Curated annotation (Swiss-Prot):
Alphabetized HAMAP family for the sequence: Transcrip_reg_TACO1
Record-given protein name: Probable transcriptional regulatory protein HNE_0161
GO process terms (BP): regulation of DNA-templated transcription
PANTHER family xrefs: TRANSCRIPTIONAL REGULATORY PROTEIN YEBC-RELATED, TRANSLATIONAL ACTIVATOR OF CYTOCHROME C OXIDASE 1
Family to which the UniProt record says this protein belongs: Belongs to the TACO1 family.
Compartments where found: Cytoplasm
A Pfam match: Transcrip_reg
Length: 252
């Protein structure tokens, strides 16, 4: 779950990196399986599968793992999955959106509600938090794609809305309805020279909520718990945490 724009520091979690990587691989493999089951095994004909494979390759999921996940989606008797969004408020009044893909809605709802209630949060109704977020396309490219100016020019020509660049990479934002077209245009521009690290629809906060101290500690704990739930695919929040506070939370 990479993210380096100002609002996305919430995606840098405490914890053992090996464990986080294993959780990430499992989550990406699951998304490939679900996409394969819902839309077929051919990424050329299945946009969701194509994006899932792009994101898996972006964090070096082995090709064999990707193929096994595709095949699993095509096997008979597999579970049926539903995509569900949960919204709530965490410690310090931070808004949180949780996207889940589950074969058991009751289990998912119970686990997510418990993660909120045991960590100073309250699970709300659909729409109770998301009005404070914009749903956008986010396409991440490595620094090797070019300079900030070069990527900005390519993104504008492709129809993107905004670009954020730093020493870690480039994040290109699009309107949700333009996501596929911009992704294709950028792929044509960069060709085989460089591939995106990730490409997905995200929830980006319109406004952020400053948080520090005990509330920040509790929020990080809640987000860690949510991240590790099997049914959870993505977690977004609108916390604003200073660099010094992030260093403290990370043990730095």
């Amino acid at each position: 779950m990479a993210g380096h724009s100002k609002w996305a520091n919430i995606q840098h979690r405490k914890g053992k990196q090996d464990k986080k990587r294993a959780v990430l691989f499992a989550r990406l493999s699951k998304e490939i399986t679900v996409a394969s089951k819902m839309g077929g095994p051919d990424p050329a004909m299945n946009p969701r599968l194509r994006l899932a494979i792009t994101n898996a390759k972006g964090v070096s999921v082995p090709k064999d793992n990707i193929q096994r996940a595709i095949d699993k989606g095509q096997s008979s008797g597999g579970a049926d999955y539903a995509d569900i969004r949960y919204e709530g408020v965490g410690p310090g009044g931070v808004g949180i959106i949780v996207e889940a893909s589950t074969d058991n809605k009751n289990r998912a709802a119970t686990d997510i509600r418990t993660a909120f209630s045991k960590n100073g949060g309250t699970l709300g109704t659909t729409g109770s938090v998301s009005f404070n977020f914009d749903q956008l396309g986010e396409i991440e490219y490595p620094v090797s794609a070019g300079s900030a100016d070069e990527v900005m020019e390519a993104a504008i020509m492709a129809g993107a809305q905004d670009v954020e660049s730093n020493e870690d990479g480039h994040w290109i934002y699009t309107a949700r309805e333009d996501f596929a077209a911009v992704s294709t245009a950028l792929a044509d521009t960069f060709g085989s020279k460089v591939e995106p690290t990730s490409a997905k629809i995200i929830w980006k906060p319109k406004v952020t909520t400053p948080i520090a101290g005990d509330a920040a500690d509790q929020l990080m704990k809640m987000l860690d718990v949510l991240d590790e739930l099997d049914d959870v695919q993505s977690v977004y929040d609108n916390s604003e945490i200073s660099e010094d506070e992030m260093a403290r939370l990370s043990g730095g």
